[in-house]
């Protein structure tokens, strides 16, 4: 032994509570929400590090070349979820403000982060379905079942629950090469 401890990689667990619902009416959901044949999914809290500001312009490039694609953006804008009247929110905001001064560059501040404005700026409102709210567990399946691929264009990565949910639905993952993604997202496999 060289005195070094072994390294064990632990990945985000797969949530077995999220799985396809048999006989779910995918075509009706697509029709109601104006979705095309091929649907890409951005799911989860809208946070700057998750790269939605990169997803929307990239999708726009694809949509300029194809008329059979749609993008679903499904998730809450993180900073809009905080109740400013609560003491816990004031404490969190204060701690984040202190941490921000110590660790973050000014460009990393996401309190005013609004990538959804890009949809209108690019004129792709008819190609993007936005569900900017909390999604209860029993409704998660809908967004994954109607989609063909999950998009994880993170600027930096932490273990991703969205990635794990995508695996339950046997979906391809389109991801940036950051964090653990190069180890868990294999080209041609998932």
What residue ranges belong to the model's regions?
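Nucleotide-sugar donor-binding and catalytic loop/hinge architecture
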Residues: 22-39, 63-66
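Short acidic/histidine- and often glycine-rich active-site loop of Leloir-type glycosyltransferases
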Residues: 165, 178-190
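Nucleotide-activated donor-binding/catalytic signature segment of Leloir-type glycosyltransferases, i.e.
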Residues: 84-138
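Short hydrophobic "strand-cap" motifs at the C-terminus of beta-strands
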Residues: 10-13, 42-44, 74-76, 131-132, ...
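Short donor-sugar binding/catalytic loops of nucleotide-sugar-dependent glycosyltransferases
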Residues: 43-47, 62, 77-79, 134, ...
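Donor nucleotide-sugar binding/catalytic pocket of nucleotide-sugar-dependent glycosyltransferases
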Residues: 1-23, 35
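Acidic donor-binding loop of glycosyltransferase active sites
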Residues: 142-159, 168-171
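Conserved donor-binding/catalytic core segment of Leloir-type glycosyltransferases
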Residues: 34-50, 56-59, 71-74
């Amino acid at each position: 032994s060289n005195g070094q401890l072994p390294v064990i990689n632990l990945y985000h667990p797969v949530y077995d509570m999220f799985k396809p619902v048999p006989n779910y009416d995918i075509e009706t959901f697509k029709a109601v929400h104006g979705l095309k044949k091929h649907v890409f999914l951005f799911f989860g809290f809208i946070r700057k590090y998750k790269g939605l500001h990169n997803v929307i312009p990239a999708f726009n490039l694809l949509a300029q070349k194809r008329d059979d694609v749609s993008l679903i953006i499904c998730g809450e804008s993180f900073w809009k979820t905080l109740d400013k009247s609560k003491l816990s929110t004031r404490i969190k905001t204060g701690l984040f403000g202190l941490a921000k001064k110590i660790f973050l560059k000014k460009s990393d501040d996401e309190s005013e982060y609004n990538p959804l404005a890009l949809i209108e700026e690019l004129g792709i409102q008819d190609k993007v379905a936005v569900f900017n709210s909390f999604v209860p567990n029993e409704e998660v399946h809908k967004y994954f079942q109607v989609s063909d691929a999950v998009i994880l264009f993170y600027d930096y990565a932490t273990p991703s629950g969205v990635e794990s949910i995508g695996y339950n639905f046997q979906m391809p993952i389109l991801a940036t090469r950051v964090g653990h993604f190069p180890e868990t997202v294999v080209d041609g496999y998932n």
